[in-house]
Swiss-Prot record:
Gene Ontology annotations for the cellular component aspect, listed alphabetically: cytoplasm
Name recorded for this polypeptide: Chaperonin GroEL
Protein residues bound to ATP: 30-33, 51, 87-91, 415, 479-481, 495
Keyword Chaperone: yes
GO biological-process terms attached to the record: protein refolding
Presence of keyword Iron: no
Key words of the record: ATP-binding, Chaperone, Cytoplasm, Isomerase, Nucleotide-binding
Catalysed reaction, written as an equation: ATP + H2O + a folded polypeptide = ADP + phosphate + an unfolded polypeptide
Enzyme class name: isomerase
Subunit structure, as described in the record: Forms a cylinder of 14 subunits composed of two heptameric rings stacked back-to-back. Interacts with the co-chaperonin GroES.
Protein encoded by which gene: groEL
Disulfide bonds: none
Pfam families noted in UniProt: Cpn60_TCP1
């Protein structure tokens, strides 16, 4: 076991605060409409330019191990806020730094750190209740556009794109952000259910110009196994052929004799058919087949439940208005499933999302909800250079998360105003003792920090603006982008209540723990002796004269 370096009391806390300040000072330059960029060196490729707080925080690792512990604890604040709300990471870091720096003065003056923490917790609870009570619902196009624009650093085109995407696919729909190929941003919307499996054979394509198979009002056969014997399919094929409608087969795989026969029948025009592999693997494949079944009104033919493909009838098949199958994707538009059954399935998947502990699983489940309930929208980012594209993608990701948070819990006045107004809710609030009341006052002062930083980044005088905002009422605040005062909601400067709330809760949680730290322990790096130099090889003796 390696030797440990141990620090106590003020010497431990001063090191920790030094680390916190390095990280927070690097992150907070990005706050607000006039926040600056941070350039991050990469060991490969071009440097990364970003205005995203959590990206900056994740890059910081300090040489001094005690300082690094402080930095990593504050990094946890921005990461947690990012996980819960998807935005507000810079605000959370600024708040954590302010609470810690205010609190440490009281600890140094001899107050009880545990009571200070309790006081901070009481104040946070009151402020969070206040934020929830003043939040206004954000369910219209304009509010969503404004939230998206503010979060994307006052970029109105991004706000418009996100609002359009939400309008098209609904609040449950999946919106993804990808790097585009041109200079302009673009929005691609796929209505209906899309999954990433194309036709098994290109001979199923009936549109030669686009190499796709388009099926109008088709029957849909879902099979939870490989099909290689054509005899299993004959009864279904004959029944479908009599109706004159096309058929889409989704199975684990279609191969051998079965595939050859389907291709021949399709090319001769006897029956219009297309075969596709089922999406996903293992249990996820079974679940997705069931989703498609509910969406289209089909029954999954599975031997696990005692069903045989040979006995399948038209009643077991689903239908849809239109299906387009390309080499890589299948899109089912307007499935004929029962609306109540679809809603029930969506509810069921949502319950699984709540219970899931894996980020990957949650993402996949969310995609399934979107495919059943709405659709999928892809925002394609356009930029002149790769560096600019990455920076813009960071901003659009933030904006997307912010709009989702706004839809969830509503919006409050932006620009740090909601937190400054929450000071009124702390008036007259007292703790069980003087130290707890001091903790409440620590938070009262600290929650002004985001507005102070926004103003400082805009090049104005923070104390003048803070006093002016405090003298106002309601949503009256300061627009750092234009240097004007006015109603923040009318000026379109909104913050999602969830983002503001999460930032404060996580900042206070970690700052409170750091205030109550009395001892820090870290490994002492071992000095490994340098490898000794290899000695030179001895010279070879001269050879004696030959006889």
């Amino acid at each position: 076991m390696s030797a440990k370096d141990v620090k106590f009391g003020d010497s431990a806390r001063s090191k920790m605060i030094a680390g916190v300040n390095v990280l927070a000072d690097a992150v907070k330059v990005t706050l607000g409409p006039k926040g600056r960029n941070v350039v991050i060196d990469r060991s490969f490729g071009a440097p990364h330019i970003t205005k995203d707080g959590v990206t900056v925080a994740k890059e910081i690792s300090l040489k001094d191990k005690f300082e690094n512990m402080g930095a990593q604890l504050v990094r946890e604040v921005s990461s947690k806020t990012n996980d819960i709300a998807g935005d507000g990471t810079t605000t959370a870091t600024v708040l954590a730094q302010a609470i810690l720096n205010e609190g440490i003065k009281s600890v140094t003056a001899g107050m009880n750190p545990m009571d200070l923490k309790r006081g901070i917790d009481i104040a946070v609870k009151t402020v969070v209740e206040n934020i929830r009570s003043i939040a206004k619902p954000a369910d219209d196009f304009k509010a969503i556009e404004q939230v998206g624009s503010i979060s994307a650093n006052s970029d109105t085109t991004v706000g418009k794109l996100i609002a359009q995407a939400m309008e098209k696919v609904g609040k449950e729909g999946v919106i993804t952000v990808e790097e585009g190929s041109g200079f302009e941003d673009a929005l691609d919307v796929v209505e209906g259910m899309q999954f990433d499996r194309g036709y098994i054979s290109p001979y199923f394509a009936n549109k030669q110009d686009t190499l796709t198979a388009e099926l109008e009002n088709p029957f849909i056969l879902l099979v939870d196994k490989k099909i290689s014997n054509i005899r299993e399919l004959i009864s279904v094929l004959e029944a479908v052929a009599k109706t004159g409608k096309p058929l889409l087969i989704i199975a684990e795989d279609v191969e051998g004799e079965a595939l050859a026969t389907l291709v021949v029948n399709n090319m001769r025009g006897i029956i219009k058919v297309c075969a596709v592999k089922a999406p996903g693997f293992g249990d996820r494949r079974k679940a997705m087949l069931q989703d498609i079944a509910i969406l289209t009104g089909a029954t999954v033919i599975s031997e696990e439940v005692g069903m045989s493909l040979e006995q399948a009838t038209l009643q077991d098949l689903g239908t849809a208005h239109k299906i387009t199958v390309s080499k890589e994707n299948t899109v089912i538009v307007d499935g004929a499933g029962d609306a109540a059954a679809i809603a029930e399935r969506v509810q069921q998947i949502r319950a699984q999302i709540e219970e899931s502990t894996s980020e990957y699983d949650r993402e996949k489940l969310q995609e399934r909800v979107a495919k059943l309930a709405g659709g999928v929208a892809v925002i394609k980012i356009g930029a002149a250079t790769e560096v600019e594209m990455k920076e813009k993608k960071d901003r659009v990701d933030d904006a997307l998360h912010a709009t989702r948070a706004a839809v969830e819990e509503g919006v409050v006045a932006g620009g740090g105003v909601a937190l400054v107004r929450a000071v009124n809710a702390l008036e007259g609030l007292k703790g069980a003792n003087e130290d707890q009341t001091a903790g409440i006052n620590i938070l009262r002062r600290a929650i002004e920090a985001p507005l102070r930083q926004i103003v400082a980044n805009a090049g104005d005088e923070p104390s003048v603006v803070i006093n002016a905002v405090k003298n106002g009422e309601g949503n009256f605040g300061y627009n750092a982008a234009t240097g004007e005062y006015g109603d923040m909601l009318e000026m379109g400067i909104l913050d999602p209540a969830k983002v503001t709330r999460s930032a404060l809760e996580h900042a206070a949680s970690v700052a409170g723990l750091m205030l109550t730290t009395e001892c820090m322990i870290t490994d002492i790096p071992e000095d490994k002796p340098a490898a000794p130099d290899m000695g030179g090889m001895g010279g070879m003796g001269g050879m004696g004269g030959m006889m």
